Curated annotation (Swiss-Prot):
Listed name of the protein: Large ribosomal subunit protein bL19
Matches recorded under InterPro entries: Ribosomal_bL19, Ribosomal_bL19_CS, Ribosomal_bL19_sf, Translation_prot_SH3-like_sf
Function: This protein is located at the 30S-50S ribosomal subunit interface and may play a role in the structure and function of the aminoacyl-tRNA binding site.
A biological process from GO: translation
PANTHER family (alphabetical): LARGE RIBOSOMAL SUBUNIT PROTEIN BL19M, RIBOSOMAL PROTEIN L19
Higher taxonomy: Bacteria, Pseudomonadati, Pseudomonadota, Alphaproteobacteria, Rickettsiales
Origin: domain of life: Bacteria
One Gene Ontology term, aspect cellular component: cytosolic large ribosomal subunit
GO MF annotation terms: structural constituent of ribosome
Length: 138
């Protein structure tokens, strides 16, 4: 491992120390919570910055794994229009990533969904079976 890879691994460890990034891929529906700064002007003319969280839920149509510059592209339909937004995976702006549904697809990049709408843009759902553990009372 060269110096740059080692430096990137250290930075990734620092950025993910207080948040957990789930394992997801193209075809999964995710809910990304992002920190947003709102700027407002008070009555006395001073500017006030407030931080709030904004959720963005949509289908992952592409994922790019490149160390600290990894990113993923999320597409959703808002008011009848397709909206795509790229998120940097390890960005401090991204507060949390939650997987809502797991999808079954045969491609790594789902750019063909841009040309589809309605039923033809649906993705089959992949069901995850979690093994239940039995507790034994002594």
């Amino acid at each position: 491992m060269n110096i740059i890879d080692h430096f990137e691994q250290e930075n990734i460890a620092k950025l993910t120390a207080n948040k957990q990034i789930p394992d997801f891929k193209a075809g999964d529906t995710v809910k990304v919570t992002v920190k947003v700064l709102d700027r407002s002007i008070e009555k006395d003319g001073k500017e006030k910055l407030t931080e709030r969280f904004q959720a963005y839920e949509g289908l992952v149509i592409a994922k790019r794994n490149r160390g600290i510059t990894s990113s993923f592209l999320v597409r959703k339909i808002s008011h009848g229009e397709g909206v795509e937004r790229r998120f940097m995976t390890y960005s401090p702006i991204v507060h949390s990533i939650n997987v809502v549904k797991y999808g079954v697809v045969r491609r790594a990049k789902l750019y063909y969904l841009r040309n589809r709408s309605g039923k033809s843009a649906r993705i089959k759902e992949r069901h995850i079976h979690i093994a239940k553990t039995k507790t034994v009372k002594a």
